[in-house]
Protein backbone atom coordinates (compact mmCIF):
# COMPACT_ATOMS: atom_id res chain seq x y z
CA UNK A 1 0.00 0.00 0.00
CA UNK A 2 1.59 3.32 -1.15
CA UNK A 3 1.45 6.19 1.34
CA UNK A 4 0.18 9.40 -0.35
CA UNK A 5 1.89 12.74 0.29
CA UNK A 6 0.24 15.87 1.77
CA UNK A 7 -0.28 17.42 -1.70
CA UNK A 8 -1.95 14.26 -2.96
CA UNK A 9 -4.23 14.20 0.10
CA UNK A 10 -5.39 17.75 -0.71
CA UNK A 11 -6.41 16.64 -4.21
CA UNK A 12 -8.39 13.61 -2.89
CA UNK A 13 -12.19 13.54 -2.78
CA UNK A 14 -14.11 13.13 0.49
CA UNK A 15 -15.08 9.53 -0.32
CA UNK A 16 -11.42 8.67 -1.08
CA UNK A 17 -10.32 10.24 2.20
CA UNK A 18 -12.91 8.17 4.07
CA UNK A 19 -11.77 4.95 2.40
CA UNK A 20 -8.13 5.75 3.28
CA UNK A 21 -9.04 6.46 6.90
CA UNK A 22 -10.86 3.12 7.13
CA UNK A 23 -7.83 1.28 5.74
CA UNK A 24 -5.51 2.99 8.24
CA UNK A 25 -7.91 2.20 11.10
CA UNK A 26 -8.92 5.81 11.80
CA UNK A 27 -12.36 7.32 12.32
CA UNK A 28 -13.89 8.17 8.91
CA UNK A 29 -17.17 9.75 10.06
CA UNK A 30 -15.87 13.36 10.34
CA UNK A 31 -15.99 16.59 8.40
CA UNK A 32 -13.65 16.95 5.41
CA UNK A 33 -11.24 19.42 7.09
CA UNK A 34 -10.90 17.40 10.29
CA UNK A 35 -10.52 14.16 8.37
CA UNK A 36 -7.76 15.67 6.20
CA UNK A 37 -5.90 16.92 9.30
CA UNK A 38 -6.20 13.54 11.00
CA UNK A 39 -4.84 11.74 7.95
CA UNK A 40 -1.94 14.17 7.58
CA UNK A 41 -1.10 13.82 11.26
CA UNK A 42 -1.18 10.04 11.03
CA UNK A 43 0.95 9.89 7.89
CA UNK A 44 3.46 12.68 8.76
CA UNK A 45 4.87 12.53 12.36
CA UNK A 46 6.21 16.16 12.11
CA UNK A 47 2.73 17.54 11.62
CA UNK A 48 1.58 15.38 14.56
CA UNK A 49 4.15 17.08 16.84
CA UNK A 50 3.04 20.52 15.64
CA UNK A 51 -0.57 19.64 16.42
CA UNK A 52 0.46 18.52 19.93
CA UNK A 53 2.25 21.85 20.56
CA UNK A 54 -0.80 23.76 19.32
CA UNK A 55 -3.05 21.78 21.68
CA UNK A 56 -0.75 22.50 24.66
CA UNK A 57 -0.72 26.23 23.87
CA UNK A 58 -4.52 26.26 23.61
CA UNK A 59 -4.82 24.44 26.97
CA UNK A 60 -2.49 26.94 28.72
CA UNK A 61 -4.43 29.91 27.31
CA UNK A 62 -7.69 28.33 28.49
CA UNK A 63 -6.27 27.87 32.00
CA UNK A 64 -5.15 31.52 32.22
CA UNK A 65 -8.57 32.70 31.05
CA UNK A 66 -10.31 30.57 33.70
CA UNK A 67 -7.99 31.90 36.43
CA UNK A 68 -8.61 35.53 35.43
CA UNK A 69 -12.39 35.03 35.34
CA UNK A 70 -12.36 33.41 38.82
CA UNK A 71 -10.38 36.36 40.24
CA UNK A 72 -12.86 38.81 38.76
CA UNK A 73 -15.79 36.89 40.29
CA UNK A 74 -14.07 36.91 43.71
CA UNK A 75 -13.56 40.69 43.50
CA UNK A 76 -17.21 41.27 42.60
CA UNK A 77 -18.33 39.04 45.51
CA UNK A 78 -16.07 40.88 47.97
CA UNK A 79 -17.46 44.22 46.77
CA UNK A 80 -21.03 42.95 47.23
CA UNK A 81 -20.20 41.79 50.80
CA UNK A 82 -18.80 45.25 51.64
CA UNK A 83 -21.94 46.99 50.42
CA UNK A 84 -24.12 44.66 52.52
CA UNK A 85 -22.06 45.30 55.67
CA UNK A 86 -22.20 49.03 55.05
CA UNK A 87 -26.00 48.95 54.88
CA UNK A 88 -26.24 46.90 58.08
CA UNK A 89 -23.83 49.22 59.91
CA UNK A 90 -25.80 52.26 58.85
CA UNK A 91 -28.85 50.72 60.52
CA UNK A 92 -26.82 50.08 63.69
CA UNK A 93 -25.19 53.57 63.49
CA UNK A 94 -21.74 52.21 62.65
CA UNK A 95 -19.15 53.37 60.10
CA UNK A 96 -16.42 51.52 58.15
CA UNK A 97 -13.15 53.22 57.23
CA UNK A 98 -11.42 51.82 54.18
CA UNK A 99 -11.77 48.66 52.05
CA UNK A 100 -11.13 45.23 53.70
CA UNK A 101 -7.75 43.68 52.81
CA UNK A 102 -7.01 40.05 51.93
CA UNK A 103 -5.79 39.34 55.52
CA UNK A 104 -9.08 40.48 57.04
CA UNK A 105 -11.01 38.33 54.51
CA UNK A 106 -8.94 35.27 55.51
CA UNK A 107 -9.62 35.92 59.21
CA UNK A 108 -13.34 36.20 58.52
CA UNK A 109 -13.26 32.92 56.61
CA UNK A 110 -11.51 31.12 59.49
CA UNK A 111 -13.95 32.57 62.02
CA UNK A 112 -16.88 31.39 59.88
CA UNK A 113 -15.41 27.87 59.81
CA UNK A 114 -15.08 27.92 63.59
CA UNK A 115 -18.65 29.06 64.04
CA UNK A 116 -19.85 26.32 61.67
CA UNK A 117 -18.08 23.60 63.69
CA UNK A 118 -19.40 25.00 67.00
CA UNK A 119 -22.91 25.18 65.54
CA UNK A 120 -22.67 21.56 64.39
CA UNK A 121 -21.63 20.43 67.91
CA UNK A 122 -24.47 22.43 69.46
CA UNK A 123 -26.95 20.78 67.07
CA UNK A 124 -25.74 17.31 68.09
CA UNK A 125 -26.13 18.16 71.79
CA UNK A 126 -29.61 19.56 71.19
CA UNK A 127 -30.67 16.41 69.33
CA UNK A 128 -29.60 14.28 72.31
CA UNK A 129 -31.66 16.50 74.65
CA UNK A 130 -35.49 16.59 74.85
CA UNK A 131 -37.47 18.53 72.19
CA UNK A 132 -38.74 21.00 74.84
CA UNK A 133 -35.18 22.02 75.79
CA UNK A 134 -34.21 22.39 72.15
CA UNK A 135 -37.16 24.68 71.53
CA UNK A 136 -35.95 26.98 74.33
CA UNK A 137 -32.32 27.14 73.12
CA UNK A 138 -32.71 29.38 69.99
CA UNK A 139 -34.48 32.06 72.02
CA UNK A 140 -31.37 32.73 74.19
CA UNK A 141 -29.23 34.66 71.65
CA UNK A 142 -32.13 37.03 71.03
CA UNK A 143 -32.12 38.12 74.74
CA UNK A 144 -28.45 39.21 74.66
CA UNK A 145 -27.86 43.03 74.52
CA UNK A 146 -25.92 44.41 71.58
CA UNK A 147 -22.61 46.12 72.37
CA UNK A 148 -22.42 48.42 69.34
CA UNK A 149 -20.21 51.25 70.67
CA UNK A 150 -17.31 49.14 72.02
CA UNK A 151 -17.05 46.61 69.09
CA UNK A 152 -14.47 47.03 66.30
CA UNK A 153 -15.04 46.67 62.53
CA UNK A 154 -13.87 43.02 62.38
CA UNK A 155 -16.00 41.96 65.34
CA UNK A 156 -19.05 43.67 63.79
CA UNK A 157 -18.64 41.63 60.61
CA UNK A 158 -18.47 38.38 62.59
CA UNK A 159 -21.58 39.33 64.59
CA UNK A 160 -23.45 40.11 61.37
CA UNK A 161 -22.59 36.66 59.98
CA UNK A 162 -23.77 35.05 63.23
CA UNK A 163 -27.02 37.04 63.18
CA UNK A 164 -27.70 35.95 59.60
CA UNK A 165 -27.17 32.29 60.58
CA UNK A 166 -29.52 32.30 63.60
CA UNK A 167 -32.85 31.96 61.73
CA UNK A 168 -31.43 29.09 59.64
CA UNK A 169 -30.45 27.22 62.83
CA UNK A 170 -33.92 27.75 64.30
CA UNK A 171 -35.60 26.43 61.19
CA UNK A 172 -33.42 23.32 61.04
CA UNK A 173 -34.04 22.53 64.72
CA UNK A 174 -37.79 23.01 64.40
CA UNK A 175 -37.99 20.80 61.34
CA UNK A 176 -36.01 18.06 63.11
CA UNK A 177 -38.36 18.17 66.12
CA UNK A 178 -41.50 17.97 64.01
CA UNK A 179 -40.12 15.09 61.92
CA UNK A 180 -39.24 13.14 65.09
CA UNK A 181 -42.69 13.68 66.61
CA UNK A 182 -44.43 12.68 63.36
CA UNK A 183 -42.39 9.46 63.14
CA UNK A 184 -43.26 8.51 66.74
CA UNK A 185 -46.98 9.07 66.14
CA UNK A 186 -46.97 6.95 62.97
CA UNK A 187 -45.23 4.02 64.61
CA UNK A 188 -47.66 4.03 67.56
CA UNK A 189 -50.81 4.10 65.33
CA UNK A 190 -49.81 1.41 62.81
CA UNK A 191 -50.45 -1.73 64.94
CA UNK A 192 -54.09 -2.05 66.11
CA UNK A 193 -55.16 -4.51 68.79
CA UNK A 194 -56.62 -7.33 66.71
CA UNK A 195 -57.74 -9.34 69.74
CA UNK A 196 -60.14 -6.62 70.87
CA UNK A 197 -61.47 -6.14 67.34
CA UNK A 198 -62.16 -9.87 66.95
CA UNK A 199 -63.85 -10.05 70.37
CA UNK A 200 -66.17 -7.16 69.46
CA UNK A 201 -67.09 -8.88 66.18
CA UNK A 202 -67.80 -12.21 67.92
CA UNK A 203 -70.01 -10.49 70.51
CA UNK A 204 -72.12 -9.01 67.71
CA UNK A 205 -72.55 -12.43 66.06
CA UNK A 206 -75.45 -14.76 66.99
CA UNK A 207 -74.59 -17.96 68.83
CA UNK A 208 -75.33 -21.37 67.28
CA UNK A 209 -77.83 -22.35 70.01
CA UNK A 210 -79.84 -19.16 69.49
CA UNK A 211 -79.87 -19.74 65.73
CA UNK A 212 -81.11 -23.35 66.11
CA UNK A 213 -83.86 -22.27 68.53
CA UNK A 214 -85.04 -19.55 66.16
CA UNK A 215 -85.06 -21.96 63.21
CA UNK A 216 -87.05 -24.60 65.14
CA UNK A 217 -89.63 -22.01 66.20
CA UNK A 218 -90.03 -20.87 62.61
CA UNK A 219 -90.50 -24.46 61.37
CA UNK A 220 -93.08 -25.22 64.09
CA UNK A 221 -95.20 -22.22 63.14
CA UNK A 222 -95.26 -23.19 59.49
CA UNK A 223 -95.77 -26.93 60.09
CA UNK A 224 -98.88 -26.23 62.22
CA UNK A 225 -100.44 -24.37 59.28
CA UNK A 226 -99.67 -27.25 56.92
CA UNK A 227 -101.24 -29.79 59.32
CA UNK A 228 -104.45 -27.74 59.46
CA UNK A 229 -104.60 -27.70 55.67
CA UNK A 230 -104.16 -31.48 55.46
CA UNK A 231 -106.92 -32.11 58.06
CA UNK A 232 -109.35 -29.97 56.11
CA UNK A 233 -108.53 -31.80 52.88
CA UNK A 234 -109.00 -35.24 54.47
CA UNK A 235 -112.32 -34.63 56.32
CA UNK A 236 -114.31 -32.23 54.15
CA UNK A 237 -115.80 -33.64 50.93
CA UNK A 238 -115.98 -31.26 47.98
CA UNK A 239 -119.42 -29.89 47.05
CA UNK A 240 -120.00 -30.06 43.29
CA UNK A 241 -121.21 -26.83 41.64
CA UNK A 242 -124.92 -26.67 40.70
CA UNK A 243 -124.71 -25.51 37.11
CA UNK A 244 -122.11 -28.05 36.01
CA UNK A 245 -121.63 -31.78 36.19
CA UNK A 246 -118.46 -33.10 37.80
CA UNK A 247 -115.57 -34.00 35.49
CA UNK A 248 -115.50 -37.80 35.98
CA UNK A 249 -119.33 -38.15 35.55
CA UNK A 250 -119.52 -36.46 32.14
CA UNK A 251 -119.91 -38.82 29.18
CA UNK A 252 -117.59 -38.71 26.21
CA UNK A 253 -120.10 -37.16 23.76
CA UNK A 254 -120.98 -34.16 25.95
CA UNK A 255 -117.33 -33.32 26.59
CA UNK A 256 -116.02 -31.60 23.47
CA UNK A 257 -113.03 -29.47 24.46
CA UNK A 258 -111.81 -27.22 21.66
CA UNK A 259 -108.38 -26.83 23.24
CA UNK A 260 -107.11 -28.28 26.52
CA UNK A 261 -105.47 -25.62 28.67
CA UNK A 262 -103.27 -26.42 31.64
CA UNK A 263 -104.91 -23.73 33.80
CA UNK A 264 -108.47 -25.11 33.56
CA UNK A 265 -107.49 -28.75 34.09
CA UNK A 266 -107.48 -29.85 37.76
CA UNK A 267 -104.28 -31.89 37.92
CA UNK A 268 -102.73 -33.05 41.21
CA UNK A 269 -99.31 -34.65 41.21
CA UNK A 270 -99.28 -35.24 44.97
CA UNK A 271 -100.70 -38.75 44.44
CA UNK A 272 -97.69 -39.79 42.43
CA UNK A 273 -95.21 -37.95 44.66
CA UNK A 274 -96.24 -38.22 48.30
CA UNK A 275 -93.32 -36.15 49.55
CA UNK A 276 -94.89 -33.00 48.06
CA UNK A 277 -98.19 -33.47 49.98
CA UNK A 278 -97.21 -30.96 52.69
CA UNK A 279 -96.38 -28.32 50.02
CA UNK A 280 -99.97 -28.01 48.73
CA UNK A 281 -101.00 -24.40 48.05
CA UNK A 282 -104.52 -22.98 48.43
CA UNK A 283 -106.02 -23.76 45.02
CA UNK A 284 -109.24 -22.27 43.65
CA UNK A 285 -110.83 -25.63 42.78
CA UNK A 286 -111.49 -28.14 45.60
CA UNK A 287 -108.98 -30.95 45.96
CA UNK A 288 -109.96 -34.40 44.64
CA UNK A 289 -109.26 -37.67 46.38
CA UNK A 290 -106.21 -39.39 45.00
CA UNK A 291 -106.96 -42.57 43.00
CA UNK A 292 -103.94 -44.24 44.60
CA UNK A 293 -105.38 -46.99 46.85
CA UNK A 294 -103.15 -48.06 49.72
CA UNK A 295 -103.10 -51.62 51.05
CA UNK A 296 -104.52 -52.15 54.59
CA UNK A 297 -101.25 -53.67 55.83
CA UNK A 298 -99.04 -50.85 54.44
CA UNK A 299 -101.16 -48.04 55.96
CA UNK A 300 -99.75 -46.43 59.08
CA UNK A 301 -101.67 -46.11 62.37
CA UNK A 302 -101.99 -42.32 62.28
CA UNK A 303 -103.30 -42.17 58.68
CA UNK A 304 -106.94 -42.95 57.90
CA UNK A 305 -107.60 -45.10 54.81
CA UNK A 306 -110.50 -43.89 52.65
CA UNK A 307 -112.27 -46.54 50.53
CA UNK A 308 -115.29 -46.24 48.27
CA UNK A 309 -117.35 -49.39 47.71
CA UNK A 310 -117.51 -50.13 43.97
CA UNK A 311 -120.99 -51.01 42.68
CA UNK A 312 -122.03 -52.45 39.31
CA UNK A 313 -123.33 -49.10 38.13
CA UNK A 314 -119.98 -47.42 38.69
CA UNK A 315 -118.23 -50.24 36.83
CA UNK A 316 -120.52 -49.75 33.83
CA UNK A 317 -120.09 -45.96 33.81
CA UNK A 318 -116.32 -46.20 34.21
CA UNK A 319 -116.08 -47.66 30.71
CA UNK A 320 -117.82 -44.61 29.20
CA UNK A 321 -115.83 -42.12 31.25
CA UNK A 322 -112.90 -40.48 29.43
CA UNK A 323 -110.47 -38.43 31.44
CA UNK A 324 -108.69 -35.44 29.91
CA UNK A 325 -105.45 -37.41 29.70
CA UNK A 326 -107.12 -40.13 27.67
CA UNK A 327 -108.62 -37.53 25.35
CA UNK A 328 -105.25 -35.99 24.86
CA UNK A 329 -103.68 -39.30 24.01
CA UNK A 330 -106.44 -40.19 21.56
CA UNK A 331 -106.37 -36.81 19.86
CA UNK A 332 -102.62 -36.58 19.50
CA UNK A 333 -101.54 -39.65 17.57
CA UNK A 334 -98.13 -39.66 16.02
CA UNK A 335 -97.92 -40.21 12.24
CA UNK A 336 -95.40 -43.01 12.69
CA UNK A 337 -97.77 -45.10 14.84
CA UNK A 338 -100.85 -44.63 12.56
CA UNK A 339 -100.83 -46.84 9.41
CA UNK A 340 -101.49 -45.36 5.95
CA UNK A 341 -105.01 -46.17 4.67
CA UNK A 342 -105.13 -48.48 1.60
CA UNK A 343 -107.13 -47.03 -1.35
CA UNK A 344 -110.36 -48.95 -2.04
CA UNK A 345 -111.68 -48.33 -5.58
CA UNK A 346 -115.14 -49.89 -5.08
CA UNK A 347 -115.76 -47.92 -1.90
CA UNK A 348 -114.76 -44.63 -3.58
CA UNK A 349 -117.06 -45.33 -6.60
CA UNK A 350 -120.00 -46.19 -4.36
CA UNK A 351 -119.73 -42.84 -2.56
CA UNK A 352 -121.85 -39.96 -3.96
CA UNK A 353 -119.99 -37.20 -5.84
CA UNK A 354 -119.65 -33.84 -4.08
CA UNK A 355 -119.49 -31.95 -7.42
CA UNK A 356 -121.60 -31.70 -10.60
CA UNK A 357 -119.93 -33.51 -13.56
CA UNK A 358 -119.68 -31.88 -17.03
CA UNK A 359 -122.13 -33.10 -19.68
CA UNK A 360 -121.70 -32.69 -23.46
CA UNK A 361 -118.78 -32.28 -25.88
CA UNK A 362 -115.38 -31.23 -24.60
CA UNK A 363 -113.45 -28.42 -26.28
CA UNK A 364 -110.41 -29.50 -28.33
CA UNK A 365 -107.20 -29.18 -26.40
CA UNK A 366 -104.87 -26.83 -28.27
CA UNK A 367 -106.32 -25.06 -31.34
CA UNK A 368 -105.18 -26.25 -34.80
CA UNK A 369 -102.87 -23.52 -36.13
CA UNK A 370 -102.61 -22.97 -39.89
CA UNK A 371 -99.40 -21.94 -41.67
CA UNK A 372 -100.26 -18.26 -42.22
CA UNK A 373 -96.66 -17.06 -42.53
CA UNK A 374 -97.04 -16.01 -46.20
CA UNK A 375 -100.30 -14.17 -45.60
CA UNK A 376 -98.83 -12.39 -42.60
CA UNK A 377 -95.82 -11.28 -44.65
CA UNK A 378 -98.00 -9.79 -47.43
CA UNK A 379 -100.24 -8.00 -44.93
CA UNK A 380 -97.21 -6.62 -43.14
CA UNK A 381 -95.70 -5.23 -46.38
CA UNK A 382 -98.97 -3.57 -47.38
CA UNK A 383 -99.37 -2.13 -43.89
CA UNK A 384 -95.89 -0.56 -43.99
CA UNK A 385 -96.54 0.87 -47.50
CA UNK A 386 -99.65 2.60 -46.25
CA UNK A 387 -98.11 3.99 -43.05
CA UNK A 388 -94.49 4.76 -43.98
CA UNK A 389 -95.04 8.53 -43.55
CA UNK A 390 -97.09 8.15 -40.34
CA UNK A 391 -95.74 5.17 -38.37
CA UNK A 392 -98.28 3.23 -36.32
CA UNK A 393 -97.86 3.90 -32.59
CA UNK A 394 -98.56 1.11 -30.14
CA UNK A 395 -101.63 1.81 -27.99
CA UNK A 396 -102.42 0.64 -24.48
CA UNK A 397 -105.28 -1.59 -25.62
CA UNK A 398 -102.97 -3.52 -27.96
CA UNK A 399 -100.42 -3.96 -25.21
CA UNK A 400 -103.10 -5.20 -22.81
CA UNK A 401 -104.38 -7.71 -25.39
CA UNK A 402 -100.87 -9.02 -26.00
CA UNK A 403 -100.21 -9.42 -22.27
CA UNK A 404 -103.53 -11.23 -21.79
CA UNK A 405 -102.67 -13.63 -24.60
CA UNK A 406 -99.25 -14.29 -23.06
CA UNK A 407 -100.85 -15.05 -19.71
CA UNK A 408 -103.26 -17.53 -21.31
CA UNK A 409 -100.43 -19.32 -23.09
CA UNK A 410 -98.42 -19.51 -19.88
CA UNK A 411 -101.39 -20.99 -18.03
CA UNK A 412 -101.95 -23.61 -20.72
CA UNK A 413 -98.30 -24.64 -20.61
CA UNK A 414 -98.44 -25.07 -16.84
CA UNK A 415 -101.56 -27.23 -17.07
CA UNK A 416 -99.95 -29.38 -19.77
CA UNK A 417 -96.85 -29.89 -17.66
CA UNK A 418 -98.97 -30.79 -14.62
CA UNK A 419 -101.05 -33.37 -16.54
CA UNK A 420 -98.09 -34.73 -18.53
CA UNK A 421 -99.79 -33.81 -21.80
CA UNK A 422 -96.67 -32.33 -23.37
CA UNK A 423 -94.95 -35.73 -23.15
CA UNK A 424 -97.86 -37.58 -24.79
CA UNK A 425 -98.00 -35.02 -27.63
CA UNK A 426 -94.31 -35.43 -28.32
CA UNK A 427 -94.76 -39.20 -28.54
Curated annotation (Swiss-Prot):
Residue positions of motif KEN box: 369-375
Originating organism: Mus musculus
Biased composition annotated in UniProt, kind: Basic residues: 83-96
Residues carrying Phosphoserine: 139, 246, 261, 337, 348
Physiological role: Microtubule-associated protein with the capacity to bundle and stabilize microtubules. May associate with chromosomes and promote the organization of mitotic spindle microtubules around them.
InterPro entries: NuSAP
The protein's name in its UniProt record: Nucleolar and spindle-associated protein 1
Chief localisation class: cytoplasm
Region (Disordered): 41-190, 235-312, 354-427
Biased composition (Basic and acidic residues): 43-55, 159-179, 394-419
Record note on quaternary structure: Interacts with DNA and microtubules. Microtubule bundling is inhibited by IPO7, KPNA2 and KPNB1 while association with DNA is also inhibited by IPO7 and KPNA2.
Keyword field: Cell cycle, Cell division, Chromosome, Coiled coil, Cytoplasm, Cytoskeleton, DNA-binding, Microtubule, Mitosis, Nucleus, Phosphoprotein, Ubl conjugation
Biased composition regions of type Polar residues, renumbered to the chain: 181-190, 252-264
Membership in a protein family: Belongs to the NUSAP family.
A GO term from the CC aspect: nucleolus
Entry domain remark: The KEN box is required for the FZR1-dependent degradation of this protein subsequent to ubiquitination.
Biased segments, Low complexity type: 119-128
GO molecular function annotation: DNA binding; microtubule binding
Pfam families: NUSAP
PTM entry text: Ubiquitinated. Ubiquitination by FZR1 may lead to proteasome-dependent degradation of this protein.
Interaction with microtubules: annotated span: 243-367
Amino acid sequence: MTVPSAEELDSFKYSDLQNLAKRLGLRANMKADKLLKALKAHLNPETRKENKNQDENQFSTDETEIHVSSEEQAETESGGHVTKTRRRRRKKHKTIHGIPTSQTLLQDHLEMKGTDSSNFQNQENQENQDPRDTAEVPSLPEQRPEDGNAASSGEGEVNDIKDSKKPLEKRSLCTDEFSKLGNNKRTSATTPNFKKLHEARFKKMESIDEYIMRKKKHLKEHSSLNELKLDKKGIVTPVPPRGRLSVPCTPARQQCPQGHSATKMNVRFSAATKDNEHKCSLTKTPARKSPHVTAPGSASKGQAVFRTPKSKATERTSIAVITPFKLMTEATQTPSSSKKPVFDLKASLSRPLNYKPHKGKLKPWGQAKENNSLNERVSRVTFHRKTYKQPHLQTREERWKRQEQERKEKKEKLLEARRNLGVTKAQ
